[in-house]
Amino acid sequence: MRRPVTRRFPYRAAPLAGPVLAALALAIGFVAHGGPLRADEKAGLAGSGVQIVPRDAAFLSASLKLREQYDRIVGSNAFAALKKLPAVARALESFEEQRTMPGSPFSMFETFMELPENEQAADLVQDMVATDTFVYGEPSCVSFVKLLQTLQQAQQAAGLIWDDEPLLELEAIEPDPEQDTPEDSVGVRAVLRPVALRADAAEQFAPGQRQTRMVVEALVANLDLLVVPDLVWGFKTAKRDVGRSQLKRVEVLAKLLVQANPDLENALKRRTVAGGEFVTFTLDGGLLPWDELAGQVEEMAGDVRGAEKVLDRLRSLDLVFAVGMVGDWVIITLGDSLDHLEKLAFQDPAKGLLSTPPFAPLRADADKPITAVSYVSEPLAEALATTPDDLGEAVDSFSNLVAAAGLPAAAERDVRRWLQRVRDEFGKRLPDPGAWMSYSFFNEQGYEGYAWDWTRNLPYDGARQLEILRHTGGTPVAVAVQRFKSDPRLLDAVVGVVEGAWSLFTTYGRPRLDAEEVDRFDAFEEHLVPLGGKLADVLRNGILPALADGQVGLVLDAKTRTKRLHDELPASAELLPLVEPAIVLPLADRKRFLGGLNDLFALADETVAAVRRMDPDVLPKGYEVPEPKKTKVEGGTVWSFPLAAAGLDDQLQPAIGVGEDAVIFSLGPQQVGRMIAAAPLETGRRLTRFNEPLAAAAAVDVEQFFDALAPWVRYVARYASVQERDGEVDPDAELSADDENEQTREALDHVRVVFEVLKTLKVAVVETAFRNEALVSHWRNVIRDLPQP
């Protein structure tokens, strides 16, 4: 049996592209510059972890000013409010009781920590994480990531192979007619037992066996990627003497542990590396039970050619763990040696990561109170991304999978041609991965930061303003808008790929279906497939040309109110905000879009008729697509589709709004009416510069979000309280504060305080634009403490 070549498949996670929306914010325009570090640039980050990390690091994550951030939190009125909550107070009282109870684990731990050497260790740990910490990976991490992805892809490939025949010949064992059958048995099933291996069983594998075999084959084909990734953690401390004392203590304790095992006699050593003292523990790869593991793998996967090379490689790899001090840094590392520590730029900052081009923006902002820095190198970004080369490898890999599936030889040829078309059409559209760097810092209102992405061939357009921000409703809970580059051939490319896939299935998949499945397939092809072509024509000739450009906006709001969401739910004494998601698109040709919209409505009617011809019973008798309700509003027209049969509030209706320069799709006509008329975006307005050329923009009103969520929390809590009291909830009832029991009232009071604390993060915004050949996201948030009680 032919098996697929174990290559790298294109299923990969995309590299980080910017900060998370919940932390977004904007600020002043910022342009990074290169060149040597000026004196004022060096001052803020001189001697920092970012400066001493080697310039070839694969990734970096650094946290600074953690003690200051911690002090800000625990010293806030918000934190004090949380501590006063009854549940928190009870938990603290219980902890204090356990802490002072003789013989309790907490009491024993506290007694242990009162020893002078342990107090020193605790103080050292607190100091280590107070001001500057980092973790980075050496280039070996790139190889390790590639290996992990290769193994994952081998597992996925194994799952795509199927066999029509079992591995064993079976015979049925009929039950003994004289054997008593349990009275409660509904029937007796014949038992199957294996009597012999199939003649070709040597070439057949069960799913688990096949997966193991393909993983081993992947290891054999990628021995160069089989490495121990070198990782380094660094912690800056002002307690050098305590650090040296604790290092000696670690060495003594480690010696006691290794003395119990003769194989580890030479594993523990003290070494001088990078100008510092390290205690190292080396686990010789040859001492690990690889032979035992190899036997288990061979039992599962059979004899895989080259598997011995994998074992030899594993035996040659040492695992080295070390902890030590270099100057005022506690360094911990895990890898195959300590050689990489010699690259730490303690003596020559020019050899550090901070001096490289991606960190030019950070160098320019080095005088700011930096709180965090993250970095992904271009090689690691490329390892994590899907590239055109991956699509090329996938052509061979999937073609081999087709061959392994037992399809005709022509199938492999046709599938290869189809995959090559996919590669040609979409490979040129894939981004070309580049380095990524971000950092954050304190500002007068909260946090602020930048993310710089040097990925090339991105599909975004940042040459103009995002005009559809004027059609987001003014003060939505959240909004995110992005402009994509125009790609007139994309629809035709997608249609061509889908048609090719359908043709392949028709030619090679249909003959493998049973008679009933063939009938369903033929009916689908006769009645519904032609409608797919009509849909493509409507999009190609009507909808897409009518849209102005590549802007796409997502809006979340909650201004429409209801007292009863559904007929079968009780009403609420207070109004409940309805969740209102919407999509907004720019419009260039209103008349053409309306023509395309009418064609879509007609196509929906054709689809219902086609489905009914396929199976008259699949739809309710007499069902037709509801006629939309047309309403004139300020700025345009709204078409809404009532859902009377669903029992939902009448305000919940799918709706389409068409204005002069925007189209809105929503679940509520009221929201469409608010959005269709142009109005300035007020959410986060004081922080933003959304009137500049941007590729993307987003804003979140955190306070408004929790204000909308709170009534629903109270409604659900009251519903649960009535359910507990009466055993059921009358749909005709109205839930109010009178329905709350004592437990519910206390829980809701806790929720109220927690929401007030969460609302101290008032708003977050982000702007994304192209600057200096990079996609730059600039974010800012506003944090306001609770008032003094």
Predicted regions and their residues:
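Bacterial N-terminal signal peptides
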Residues: 17-32
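Short cationic amphipathic helices and targeting signals
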Residues: 59-61, 227-238, 322, 328-333, ...
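Sec/Tat signal peptide C-region and signal peptidase I cleavage site
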Residues: 33-39
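N-terminal secretory signal peptides that target proteins for export/translocation
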Residues: 1-16
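A cross-kingdom feature marking solvent-exposed beta-strand/loop segments within repeated
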Residues: 44, 260-319, 621-653
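Structural boundary/hinge residues at secondary-structure and domain interfaces
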Residues: 40-230, 234-294, 372-420, 453-578, ...
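Extended terminal
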Residues: 39-41, 45, 50, 428-429, ...
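A conserved glycine-rich beta-strand in the N-terminal activation segment of trypsin-fold
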Residues: 311-397, 401, 649-731, 735-737
